[in-house]
Amino acid sequence: QRLEWQRDPVEIHAFHVDVPAGVKQLHLEFEFVTPTDTSQGRVTMTPDLLGLQWEKTLLYPAGFYARQIPVAAAVQLPAGWQFASALRGAQRAGDTVQFATVPLETLVDSPLFAGPHYRRVELDPSSQGPVRLNIFADTPQELQATDEQLDKHRRVVGEAVALFGSRHFREYD
C-alpha cells in the first residue's frame, strides 16, 4: 500500500508520513543520488568503487534513540563485486548481501566498501582480536602493496594497543 508523505518545510532531512493505525513495519524504497564530483560533495561511488555510508541512505522514525532502532540492512551489488564491512552475519545470495539485525547506531558506524578489485590483508590474525586491512582499487594493479607499506600498517596495530592499553574490539576490519 502506498503511503502519502511530505518533506518537512523547515528540516530538509525530515519527512512526514501518514501511517495507518496498527502498522508495525514499513518497507521503504528510494534512490540515493551520490555526488560525482568533489564540487558537489564527498564522492562515495565510482564505476568501480563504492563507499556506502548507511546514514546517507536510510530513513528512521523520529523520537527514538538510534541504539533502540533495530535494522536488518541489505545491499544489492553489481555482479562480480566483493565487499567488506565491520557488520557481521553477512549472508550473500547472488548479488544481494543481507546483514544480521543490529541497532541503527551500529549500522551507521559500519560503512560498507565494495568493488570488483579487492584484496584482504591480515595485519594481526591473533586470537586477541584479528585485525584486517581491506583494500579496494580501480584496477587490479593498484591492489599491490609493498612489504614496507604493509609493515607500517601492522605496526599501527601494536602502537594502538600500546596507546590504549587493550583491544576494545573482537575483530577489526
Spans of model-derived segments:
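Non-catalytic architectural context of zinc metalloproteases
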Residues: 1-156, 162-170
